[in-house]
Amino acid sequence: MLVLFETSAGFALFKVLDEGKMKSKPVDINNFFETPEKASSFVSLKKFYKFDGTLDALEAQTAIAECKVPESLSNFLKKNVVSEKLNEQLIVSDSKFGNAIKDALNIKVLCDDTTQELIRGIRLQLKSLVNANEQDLNAMSIGLSHSYSRYKLKFSPDKVDTMIVQAISLLDDLTTEINIYAMRAREWYGWHFPELGKLITNHTQYANAIKAMGNRKSAVDTDFTDILPEEVAEEVKEAAQISMGTEISPEDLDHIFALCDQFLSIQAYHTELTEYLKSRMEAIAPNLTILVGEIVGARLICRAGSLMNLAKYPASTIQILGAEKALFRALKTKHNTPKYGLIYNAKIVGEASLKNKGKMSRVLAAKAALSARFDALCEVSDTSYGIAYKGAVDRRAAAIEGREVRKSLNAVKPEKSGNVAKYDHTKSATTNTTRDVATKSSKESSIKQEKQDVKMEEASSSDSDSSSDSDSSEEEKSKKSKKSKKEETPVAKEEKKEKKSKKEETPVAKEEKKEKEEKKEKKDKKEKKEEKEDKKEEKKEKKDKKEKTEETPVAKEEKKEKKEKKEEKEEKKDKKEKKEKKEEKEEKKEKKEKKSSSKEDKKEKEEKKEKKSSSKEDKKRKDRDEEPEEKKSKKSKK
């Protein structure tokens, strides 16, 4: 067995002296490398290949990291293993690297738990086994590690984007915390001075005013010149004298001051972080920041994962980036897909009118894709592309917003008037289709006319031949119809009787229909009422969300109660529907039974009628038979 060991100085090829020890457990192999003497008795150095320099070592290390066999190692193994025609197995530290050696040089490779313990023992006693100086090995390892780290950083631009990704995610977290702390301070201090919240809308001004004023009684003596404008300060002083709030203890004020201090510190760090993010975006993606802005650009990079991934995306994905849920929901329900995602927060899209926001987002996404590619792949950072694209997008926005009617062949001619009508994109979109339909209809009408002319000519030529045949066929048809009327089967008679009985039962059927319609109307009314109640509840929930950004424990309990009520309503609905279905089934069964009973009664009546008719016929026959006998008796008497 041979062992391949990679070091920073070169490749070492060891030979296992006692292969029987390899069959022992992996834990026992550590005992064979406790001392240099034991290690030399178990493993011996066969050959060692030394690197020419750090460049040679770096090439070999990069190839091994990519699971490729470097040329230096392949030549080394060919000389010492393949040329000597050794059928021994080669022990390797990595299984993937071993498969690469097996494919390239056709050498048997081994890698398992015992081999890993063997390589660990060789690494422990490497100095004694190779007979190398410790300082030289350390110097080679440090040089190789520095050069390899430089190589990895040079060819991985994704590592630089992590600063932007982490900064924008932290900025979003800070904004949520700031809103939570501000609302908490307003609710807490609102018990003491509720009028202050309506007078001061800015959160930072509100917190500074609380810190400066403290208790509302001292509002008259406090100076708000550095915090608030003069008009607002006077209103605050007047409101403090007529406030409806409750009294507050000094301990409560201390806790409110601590909350305000924490809020102001987070706010200050938020501003510092935005400045840091702006500087990083200008350094890493200057063209994208000019076009979209630093915050929107950072969010796009964060959503894509890195600037390189964003550069690989087409303009269509950049346009919808951030609206993946809405996109998949639209595809699932077969509705219209969203027109914009995170790019909606850009300044250019926000300034556009509501009708043209989709067009502006598409134009901006196209230029943003190009600017991201320049930022990711250009060696020299230059803002010329971003400035040029910004001007092009601004011109396009001006053209879209203040656009006149385009002169085209497909467009509908406008009416003659003094004022020029604005361009309507909805009409122009349908002009091509209407024109195509008109041309198709004209072509189809001409083709139909030609076909009709041909048919008429053929019919006129064949009229003289088929006149006699048509007369004879009509006579035969009339005879057959008369025969069929005369020869009506008993089955046809029964069908006629059933139809008559159905006509007689019309009032009952009408009453049943009326009952069904009344039930349907009641159901519809109930459903409409329930839908209205659900809509009212949804509106109330939306209002509560707008008023309060954070959910208090009371609000959570209310939500739970609402959910439970909804579930109870749904269960009641299900039970009602099941009951209604059962009632409908029972009604159907009763109707079927009634119909079957009515049919049986009819059959009995018909049978009685038939018996009566048959009895009458028998009497008539008897009377007929008796008459000639009486006549004969009279003649005999005469």
From Swiss-Prot:
Report the record's Gene Ontology biological process terms: ribosome biogenesis
Coiled-coil annotated spans: none
Q: Which SUPFAM superfamilies match?
A: Nop domain
> Any idea which UniProt keywords this protein has?
Nucleus, Ribosome biogenesis
Q: Residue limits of the Nop domain? A: 284-402
Q: Which GO terms describe its molecular function?
A: snoRNA binding
Instruction: Give the source's domain of life in one word.
Output: Eukaryota
What SMART domains has UniProt attached to this entry?
NOSIC
Please tell me one Gene Ontology term that the record gives under cellular component: nucleolus
Locations listed in the record? Nucleus, Nucleolus
User: Which Pfam families does the record cross-reference, listed alphabetically?
Assistant: Nop (PF01798), NOP5NT (PF08156)
Region span, Disordered = 416-638
Q: Where is the composition biased (Basic and acidic residues)?
A: 437-458, 485-521, 527-574, 580-632
Q: Which family does it belong to?
A: Belongs to the NOP5/NOP56 family.
Q: What does this protein do?
A: Involved in the biogenesis of box C/D snoRNAs. Part of the small subunit (SSU) processome, first precursor of the small eukaryotic ribosomal subunit. Could function in the small subunit (SSU) processome, first precursor of the small eukaryotic ribosomal subunit. During the assembly of the SSU processome in the nucleolus, many ribosome biogenesis factors, an RNA chaperone and ribosomal proteins associate with the nascent pre-rRNA and work in concert to generate RNA folding, modifications, rearrangements and cleavage as well as targeted degradation of pre-ribosomal RNA by the RNA exosome.
Its name, as the record gives it, is Nucleolar protein 58
Organism of origin is Dictyostelium discoideum (Social amoeba)
Q: Which gene encodes it?
A: nop58
